[in-house]
Swiss-Prot record:
Any one Gene Ontology BP term: gluconeogenesis
Signal sequence segment: none
Main location as per UniProt: cytoplasm
Residue stretches in coiled coil: none
InterPro entries listed in its UniProt record: PEP_carboxykinase_ATP (IPR001272), PEP_carboxykinase_C (IPR013035), PEP_carboxykinase_N (IPR008210), PEPCK_ATP_CS (IPR015994)
Organism this protein belongs to: Alkaliphilus oremlandii (strain OhILAs) (Clostridium oremlandii (strain OhILAs))
Record's protein name: Phosphoenolpyruvate carboxykinase (ATP)
Length: 526
């Protein structure tokens, strides 16, 4: 196929119905008038994305061509597809958009000028273009003159594939083509596919520049100390990094350079199931005019939102620009991280609520990426399921996990960054018997870790997972810190702990070319 960018420039972008970087007001107006959008009492635009309310990982492909073939860690998550399949779908896309009204966002991903990437997002829905405008970094005056995107996203929810003809998995497709520098999305109205596709592109490109891309949130204290929060969807990244005593750098995607960390994005995409003003005031207050709410339940007569209602999905989302968060770091940058927090939502209830990690343990747990998949974040998940997602973001990491872990280990060692594993999941028993760890306790533990208050306390070793558990922590009951003591039945605890330990050991077998120092972190099954 000819250069896709040239085809887009000479074809799609030459029609009369193209809107470039429309103001928020206009996009909202179109979404309400033509796309079923409803304005809530708080001013946010409410959109229902239909049957696809989460990512469709089975439908994501990477075009397998020479420039990427030897670099990508091909697996069931990183599935290859031929250039021919892509070309055929792109031709369908060109026919699909003929004479359509289209919305184009031109801006950037990456707040560090040395590493930012100019992107173009082309949408057939105004609300998705509003999403792109609020999620990515808007251009400043003059930055769109002679704009030359390095990557283009073409998102066409109404273009559905025919698997038998098109070689896809279903009617939905998300295809990354690095040779043509384009992401082609069809069949799904879930806006998160746009965001995560560009994240995946950055995760592929940056390690070649000695930058560690990270699925994490980041914040900074008044004294300049930076903290990173890693974790899969629903583990508490957004919630825990929204701290009134610290400034938010970003809530989901960052890069770590020799100079510090930078946010990839200009917005936030927060889960809002069971959202309350009391528990999460920063997120609550950010949901206002200009924000988008996906798949929440709204009373169309009163405009009242019921954040507790999950009739469409548990994966309800709010998208808003980072400046809607009070005291956010609008330049999106911070210094070298002082503290790293790995978040896991352990549904077995056996991991400690907080444990301090060595460099080798940090690399091990980073590569393992253990959590329990929570309902609604992907299609088909209705109860928590144990899962291992490398680098706490497996679906978005295209290179070998060892590549990212090596970069992390080097940076931890070079800058003496402290690392903690924090369990935001269950305590006192597994899911269904125990209870979710209280948010106020988790906040206190995280605060103590960041302030260095856990550097001087005594630690005990967990006999199975070999984790260092603090014996005390400010504002946290002592009995909460040691998980075995929160269970009524010690034998049941031992059984569950050994089951999870076996899962860790089994999962880590897939990493063959790692040092013994890291392999030896494996739990000791008893």
């Amino acid at each position: 196929m000819n250069n896709v960018k040239e085809l887009i420039d000479s074809g799609i972008l030459k029609t009369n119905k193209i809107h470039y970087n429309l103001p928020v007001e206009e996009l909202i107006k179109i979404a309400v008038e033509k796309e079923g959008g409803v304005i809530a009492k708080n001013g946010a635009l409410c959109i229902n994305t239909g049957k696809y309310t989460g990512r469709s990982p089975e439908d994501r492909f990477i075009v397998d061509e020479p420039s990427v073939h030897d670099h990508i860690n091909w697996n069931k998550g990183n599935k290859g597809i031929s250039a021919q399949v892509f070309d055929n779908l792109f031709n369908k896309a060109m026919a699909h958009v003929k004479d359509k009204e289209l919305f184009v966002f031109e801006g950037f991903v990456g707040s560090d000028l040395d590493y930012r990437m100019p992107i173009r997002v082309i949408n057939e829905f105004a609300y998705q273009n509003l999403f792109a405008s609020q999620m990515f970094i808007k251009p400043k005056a003059g930055e769109r003159e002679n704009f030359d995107p390095e990557f283009t996203v073409l998102a066409l929810p109404d273009l559905k594939a025919d698997p038998a003809v098109d070689g896809t998995n279903s009617e939905v497709f998300i295809i990354l083509n690095f040779a043509q520098k384009i992401v082609l999305i069809g069949g799904t109205r879930y806006s998160g596919e746009i965001k995560k596709s560009i994240f995946t592109v950055m995760n592929y490109l940056l390690p070649f520049k000695d930058v560690l891309p990270m699925h994490c949130s980041a914040n900074i204290g008044e004294d300049g100390n930076v903290a990173l929060f890693f974790g899969l969807s629903g583990t508490g990244k957004t919630t825990l990094s929204a701290d009134n005593n610290r400034k938010l750098i970003g809530d989901d995607e960052h890069g770590w350079t020799a100079n510090g960390v930078f946010n990839f994005e200009g917005g936030c995409y927060a889960k809002c199931i069971n959202l309350t003003e009391e528990q999460e005031p920063q997120i609550w207050n950010a949901i206002k005019h200009g924000a988008i709410l996906e798949n929440i339940v709204i009373d169309e007569n009163t405009g009242h939102i019921d954040y507790d209602d999950d009739r469409y999905t548990e994966n309800t989302r709010a998208a808003y620009p980072v400046e809607y968060i009070d005291d956010a770091v609008l330049e999106g940058k911070g210094g070298i991280p002082n503290t790293i927090i790995f978040l896991t939502a352990d549904a077995t209830g056996v991991l400690p609520p907080i444990a301090k990690l060595t460099k080798e343990q940090a690399m091990y747990h980073f590569m393992s990426g253990y959590t329990s998949k929570l309902a609604g974040t992907e299609r088909g998940i209705v109860e928590p399921t144990a899962t291992f997602s490398t680098c706490f973001g497996g679906p978005f990491m295209l290179l070998k996990p060892q590549t990212y872990a090596k970069l992390l280990g080097e940076k931890i060692e070079k800058y003496n960054t402290r690392v903690f594993l924090v369990n935001t999941g269950w305590t006192g028993g597994p899911y269904g018997i125990g209870s979710r760890m209280k948010l106020k306790y988790t906040r206190s533990m995280v605060r103590a870790a960041i302030k260095g208050e856990l550097d001087q306390v005594e630690y005990i070793k967990d006999p199975i997972f070999n984790l260092s558990i603090p014996t005390t922590c400010p504002e946290v009951p002592v009995e909460v810190l040691e998980p075995s003591k929160t269970w009524d039945n010690q034998d049941e605890y031992d059984q569950k702990a050994n089951e999870l330990a076996k899962s860790f050991v089994e999962n880590f077998k897939k990493f063959d070319d790692v040092s013994d120092d890291i392999k030896n972190v494996n739990p000791k099954v008893q």
